[in-house]
């Protein structure tokens, strides 16, 4: 029996904050995400996310597996954060960060096991085509993605609003499916 604990879902917030509270905090959640500490201490959200990203991503993650090139892992995370919601191949990522496909696959597998990112395969009625299609990568939490990019600008000043919404909706759907 395995249970996955995700960042707080909109459904959970609805129970504690009500519909009005959920609507009022929506932009904040698109930018800062839904980790419990971030929700409970909104004034310190940036600092909490930077600390979480640095300790969780770099200390805990590097201790978990023998990551020989931590700088490369950082570059890969940045590349994934910049290309969130876009179809991307391992080959393209390898070229972007300057390594081989095998290393990219290993690091992405590690990031998935640590519940930082998840991937969705493209859909096709032809199974062979579906297997060949590039994947889309998403972050479990928008706040972690934005901490990696060091971008907490308001939605009105951002170029990636569509990507933030898509990542938010997909991660919310994932939570709803897991908790159902």
Where are the predicted features?
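A generic structural signal for short hydrophobic patches within well-formed alpha-helices
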Residues: 10-13, 144-145
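Accessory nucleic acid-recognition modules appended to NTPase machines
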Residues: 39, 43-180
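Phosphate-backbone binding and catalysis cores of DNA-processing enzymes
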Residues: 2, 37-39
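A short helix-turn-beta junction within AAA+ P-loop NTPase domains corresponding to the substrate/partner-engaging
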Residues: 1-11
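Helix-loop-helix "sensor" segment of P-loop NTPases
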Residues: 14-25
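Short, glycine/charged-enriched secondary-structure capping and boundary segments
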Residues: 1, 19-20, 152-154
